[in-house]
Each structure stands twice: as structure tokens, then as C-alpha cells.
Amino acid sequence: MAYPAQMGFQDATSPIMEELLYFHDHTLMIVFMISSLVLYTISLMLTTSLTHTNTMNAQEVETVWTILPAIICILIALPSLRILYMMDEINNPSLTIKTMGHQWYWTYEYTDYENMTFDSYMTSTNDLTPGELRLLEVDNRMVLPTELPIRVLVSSEDVLHSWTVPSLGLKTDAIPGRLNQTTLMASRPGLYYGQCSEICGANHSFMPIVLELIPLKYFEKWLLTML
């Protein structure tokens, strides 16, 4: 959940988001070290007299500034590729959900069950109850079990949308005529909010996403009430 004036990421609720946070910290440390080196070099140039103005060849320096950037690129690329493969890996999902984007609402279909489809519209400000969040609440939440691998199929019936839930590390484009997929596995129950992250028209800002993650036994009871 995001907080007012928050400067960092939301708390991770899935293994993928935890990996993304580690990768962010790893990359940020490399950027900090490079920035420090550049600032140190600039300060030396400004505070010392010019030397080696007649140097025509510096083999050692050329070797360093060729090898060092290559090492830095490798240190960034390897963990990045690892996370990319993790995000695309879907092994024996326990549940499959099909998400369809519309202007301007979402439709969720639980493909493992018959006639298990519903629309999810934003709750208007006048209908909010105390404690609910403006522009983030919906009339029908997507209810999912925790600690189980879940596959989400994402597409659109009109224009480009993007199904995004930051705390789970999810962002999948909804493209008309194309079926994209992503996977999630929540580590703890709770309400998790997201929004459409692709400009899709006049009411783009009014396409919230709400996931209600609950233990499996409560999810089974919820299914019985919906079927």
C-alpha cells in the first residue's frame, strides 16, 4: 500500500517484487559509485593545475576505461536477465484468470470454473464508505488465494491498457487481439491496489485494480458463494 509523500517502493508482496527491489538497490549502488567517481574526477580537475598536457599515449588508462564499463554492464545485465526469466516462468499454475481491459473498466474471468465472470468498475466518490480510498476502490474485487502460483492472461477489447499492481511487481500490457500472460504468487493476505498504466482515453485515471488475497480455505468458501 502506498502512503502520502512516500519516496520509495511499496512493500513487496511476492517473490518477484522482492527480486526487483534487490535489483533496484544493486543498480542504484553501481550508479552511486560511478557518480562519486565522476564528481571526484571533476573536483580534481578544478582544484589542481593542469598536468600531462602533452601526453600523446596512455595505454593503461585506455585499457581501464574499456574493461571497467564492460564489467559494470555485466554486473547489471546478469541479475536483470535472471529476473526477466523468472517473470516469464510459469510452472503448473493452480489457477488461471483472464483479464480483459475495456474503456474504462476491467473484466475478470476465472477460466477454471463455468460462468465465473464479472466486471470491475471504479466506485464513485459518492458511494464510498469511511476508510475507503478515493479513485482506488471498485465494486467487484479480484479475489485470489495466497501462496499459490496463479497465471493471469491479459488482453483488451478496444484500445491499449496496462494491468499493473506495484506491490506484486506486476505490469502487463493489454493489447487488442493479443493475449499476454504473467504470473503471481502472493506471500501474505491483504488488499492490493493498482491502476491502468497505459493512457487509454478520457477516463484512463478511473480504471483501478483491487486484488483481495486471502488464504485458500476462505477462497474456496468465496467460490461457493459465486458459483
Curated annotation (Swiss-Prot):
Record's bilayer topology term: Multi-pass membrane protein
Keyword field contains Cytoplasm: no
Classification via InterPro entries: CcO_II, CcO_II-like_C, CcO_II_C, Copper_CuA, Cupredoxin, Cyt_c_oxidase_su2, Cyt_c_oxidase_su2_TM_dom, Cyt_c_oxidase_su2_TM_sf
Protein name from the UniProt record: Cytochrome c oxidase subunit 2
Major site of localization recorded for this protein: mitochondrion
Residues where Phosphotyrosine is found: 218
Catalytic EC class: translocase
GO CC term (a single one): respiratory chain complex IV
Subunit structure: Component of the cytochrome c oxidase (complex IV, CIV), a multisubunit enzyme composed of 14 subunits. The complex is composed of a catalytic core of 3 subunits MT-CO1, MT-CO2 and MT-CO3, encoded in the mitochondrial DNA, and 11 supernumerary subunits COX4I, COX5A, COX5B, COX6A, COX6B, COX6C, COX7A, COX7B, COX7C, COX8 and NDUFA4, which are encoded in the nuclear genome.
Catalysed reactions, as listed in the record: 4 Fe(II)-[cytochrome c] + O2 + 8 H(+)(in) = 4 Fe(III)-[cytochrome c] + 2 H2O + 4 H(+)(out)
Residues spanning the membrane: 15-45, 60-87
Family: Belongs to the cytochrome c oxidase subunit 2 family.
Entry keyword set: Copper, Electron transport, Magnesium, Membrane, Metal-binding, Mitochondrion, Mitochondrion inner membrane, Phosphoprotein, Respiratory chain, Translocase, Transmembrane, Transmembrane helix, Transport
GO biological process: ATP synthesis coupled electron transport
Cofactor(s) of this protein: Cu cation
Binding site for Cu cation A1: 161, 196, 200, 207
Localization annotation: Mitochondrion inner membrane
Protein encoded by which gene: MT-CO2
Binding site for Cu cation A2: 196, 198, 200, 204
Function (record text): Component of the cytochrome c oxidase, the last enzyme in the mitochondrial electron transport chain which drives oxidative phosphorylation. The respiratory chain contains 3 multisubunit complexes succinate dehydrogenase (complex II, CII), ubiquinol-cytochrome c oxidoreductase (cytochrome b-c1 complex, complex III, CIII) and cytochrome c oxidase (complex IV, CIV), that cooperate to transfer electrons derived from NADH and succinate to molecular oxygen, creating an electrochemical gradient over the inner membrane that drives transmembrane transport and the ATP synthase.
Organism: Daubentonia madagascariensis
Segments on the Mitochondrial intermembrane side according to the record's topology features: 1-14, 88-227
Binding-site residues for Mg(2+), renumbered to this chain: 198
Cofactor binding annotation: Binds a dinuclear copper A center per subunit.
